[in-house]
From Swiss-Prot:
InterPro entries to which the protein is assigned, alphabetical: DUF2371_TMEM200
Listed name of the protein: Transmembrane protein 200A
Main location class: membrane
Family: Belongs to the TMEM200 family.
Biased composition (Polar residues): 20-30
UniProt keyword annotations, A-Z: Glycoprotein, Membrane, Transmembrane, Transmembrane helix
Domain of life: Eukaryota
Claim: ATP-binding is one of the keywords in the record: no
Extracellular side: 83-127
Species the sequence originates in: Danio rerio
Extent of Low complexity compositional bias: 353-375
Residue spans crossing the bilayer: 62-82, 128-148
Compartments (UniProt record): Membrane
Amino acid sequence: MIATGGVITGLAALKRQDSTRSQYHLSAQSPGPAPEKKTTKRKPRADVVVVRGKIRLYSASGFFLVLGVLILMAGIAMAVLGYWPHKDQPKAPETKMSANNTQSFGREQAGSIAQFLEQHMHSEKMKMLGPFTMGIGIFIFICANAILHENRDRETKVIHMRDMYSTVIDIHSLRIKEQKCTNGACMGPYGGDTEIRTFGLDSQFASRLAANTLMSFSGLDGDVRFSHRTSSADDDDGLMSEARGGFCLLSPTYKDRSECIFGFQDDGRWEDRRGALKKCQTRSIVSSSISAFTLPVIKLNNCVIDEPDIDSITEDLEQSRVHSRPPSMESLTVPVPDIAKAFKPPGVQLLRSNSATESASSTSSRSSLSPGSTSGRFLSPGAARKDFGSNNSIHMLSAHSKSLDLERGPTKLTVQPEQRKHPSWPRLDRSNSKGYTRLENKEDPMDRLIVPPVDVKKDYTKKEKLLMISRSHNNLSFEHDEFMSSGLKRGTSETRF
């Protein structure tokens, strides 16, 4: 079958050659621009190059091919001797005797070959063995021919595979070079987009929200505030602008992540490296606030912070905004804790809006600088790690995140006594969080620590408000130092789920 297939392919090739020759003769006979037609017809044949292996006759299959041909020739000769036609029959006996004498004389002269031919001429053995020998020769010839063509096809396959491998390797090397060139040209020194793939959508939104929170607490850009946005496009633009404003506050590792997520780089990157001292002062606050931002609602060390009434704060909101100035990182001071004035029966209040947070931060900064307030000291890196640790930043971020989740404007808010007792209810009720259970009638360990609230006067002067805010910060720092001295771990917190 393989031999017949090879013969059929050869016949098809001959037919193609005949068709091309006939077309060539017709084009030569037809008048017109003959050379142009010749060139146009020869070009596609020159482009198509059929690569095939060689038929190697100097091999075992070639030897058997020759052997089969020889056996076939011997069988043909034997069949010819057996089926050689007979002569005319003798006419008379006299002539027959004379003919026998002449034949005997010719036999002596002819020799052994003539004797062999005369003996096996018209013999039954030759008639039988001749075709049989021919069949054996033909069988050996066909098998050897098939083996020769199989070897040639194997060589052609090897050649094609080598060509394919070489082309694939060349294409792969060219692609690698192109990718290197494109990565070096487009990505530049920050090469690659692997960090973008590693961070998902949740980490992107969390980092954006963390950048916005840092902007609100840093005060470097006083005009940046959280506002209610209706469209998603305006929300993305606002987040990008706020992240660019607070980009200088991030530590180096988070700055690289924010570069990958937001898609921009800091313009004054090299200038910020020169001011490493200022970064050293703010790095502890930023790192602790970012690490604590992804935590749920947190209650700090089982203590309640004493804060003024939210109704009295919201009444003087516009006046505090007029007189407040954006605080800088150099003006941040840590009040020295006063043990005599530290403890006060706490009245639990919640900051419900970003405006209340801004007014509280501005009044606290002014109280630290005013002569009537408690004595303070400038912020150093060690003090930042100690006083502005994870506890304070977590409290600030939790209060601020509540204002973000509630999405309330700078309006007057009232706090129910049940909500004062359980500060995590509004966030868990209004957010789409799953897995949280409300502790309604169960015994709360905070109830044991909370002293019955004292009636607070509604009419406070500005000095009294400032004193109350400063006492709340003194209360927090005093309890923090007390826990540190007792051997507890830093940043211990109780998470309510």
